[in-house]
Amino acid sequence: MTDAIFRGMTRAELDRQYDQRTLVPRMALLFDDWRRRSDIFASRRGLPHRISYGRHQLQGFDLFEVPNPQGLHIHYHGGAWKALESHHAWWVAEPWLNAGHCFASIDFRLVPTVPLAEQVGDARLALAKAQELMASSMSLTVSGHSSGAHLAAMAVLAPEEGQLPPDCDHLILASGIYDLEPVRLSGRNDYLRLDHHDAVALSPKARLEGTL
């Protein structure tokens, strides 16, 4: 397809923009390194506690604790919404634990096993469950990487209907996707299966702009 479909870009150009392998062709080696770094970290620090927030095995998170914590840091892993798991991000915990914060690495059901809307729902449920473990004096920091940054933003900015936004002190989003409309028009939609309404409803950008 050679016609421009989004801000002057063709489908092929969008596909290149949303395929990390165009810049990092050996992605599998990077993922393996994350697991290796996580295993090395856990061998020194000890394994985390597994906390469930739902019935599915992926509706849970890995919690690293510290004595007398100052805060809780919650992290959502990347993986294009369809891959990886909480274990890949254990190594991210080290500086937070050293600073006196507990660290929760979140799992969630993956696309296309569930639609993206349900994955976002998992992200919200996990955040709510993790907050139940906090003392009122603890600070809350939330982060996410890549597609996990999208989930982190949605969990913080767009709670379930009737719920108040979490009292989040800091939101750290790395290389995230905040407007899903160009994603919908790219090859990613072969497994995301979003329509225009979905793309708007599940976009943090729309929440911030007040278009919902």
Q: Model-predicted segments: where are they?
A:
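Hydrophobic/aromatic beta-strand patches that form the interior of the parallel beta-sheet core
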Residues: 51, 74, 104, 141, ...
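Catalytic metal-binding/acid-base residues of hydrolase active sites
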Residues: 80, 109, 177-178
